[in-house]
């Protein structure tokens, strides 16, 4: 059966030459095989194991002070420059300035690929789709994808097979105690 966590990591979506995959996704089993002298062990239970790990938040040697559940002492990235560039690209595309949108999008892609060969020249809807695809890759496993899908109205088509219900899952339920205390109206569907 499908495991929801299997779809949170877009490992197969990265193009050849895209350097982001190596710093985003860690195939722990392949890493163990390639580095037998390290004698790597890791705990799976009680978590689901897809075989892939979020490389962005794995602690590095010497960074293992603090709580394991909080990713040790790793900083949580609230916003990144690439995110700002992609937001600008989307805004310029939506306001009809595709040239400016391409410029911001391609700044991100040039860093990712290290060349000019992967620039996007699409316009209109195709450019918009390219910007959204770039957000998926650039911000992979940083907690943005769900909100991008909801914001763009694509959540039901992408997440429907995982149980997403349009008109309900765009919002989280308000804890019942808060509803009772404050006399709030619960979000739809809960």
What are these regions (language model features)?
Residues 1-3, 71, 76, 109, ...:
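Long, intrinsically disordered, low-complexity segments
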Residues 18-21, 75-108, 128-140:
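Extended, hydrophobic/aromatic-rich amphipathic alpha-helical segments that build helical scaffolds
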Residues 9-81:
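Flexible, polar/acidic helix-loop-strand segments at domain edges
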Residues 31-32, 99-100, 147-148, 156:
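Flexible loop/turn segments at secondary-structure boundaries
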Residues 14-15, 93, 150:
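Hydrophobic residues in alpha-helical segments
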């Amino acid at each position: 059966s499908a495991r929801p966590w299997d779809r949170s990591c877009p490992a197969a979506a990265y193009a050849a030459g895209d350097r982001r995959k190596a710093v985003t996704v860690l195939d722990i089993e392949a890493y163990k095989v390639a580095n037998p002298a390290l004698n790597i062990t890791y705990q799976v239970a009680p978590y689901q194991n897809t075989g892939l790990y979020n490389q962005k938040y794995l602690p590095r040697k010497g960074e293992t002070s603090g709580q394991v559940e909080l990713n040790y002492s790793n900083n949580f990235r609230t916003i990144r420059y690439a995110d700002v560039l992609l937001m600008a690209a989307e805004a310029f595309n939506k306001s009809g300035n595709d040239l400016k949108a391409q410029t911001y999008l391609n700044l991100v892609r040039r860093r990712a690929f290290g060349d000019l060969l992967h620039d996007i020249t699409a316009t209109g809807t195709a450019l918009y789709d390219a910007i959204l695809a770039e957000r998926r890759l650039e911000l992979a496993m940083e907690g943005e994808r769900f909100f991008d899908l909801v914001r763009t109205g694509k959540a039901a088509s992408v997440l429907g097979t995982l149980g997403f219900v349009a008109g309900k899952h765009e919002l989280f339920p308000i804890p019942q105690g808060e509803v009772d205390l404050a006399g709030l109206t619960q979000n739809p569907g809960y």
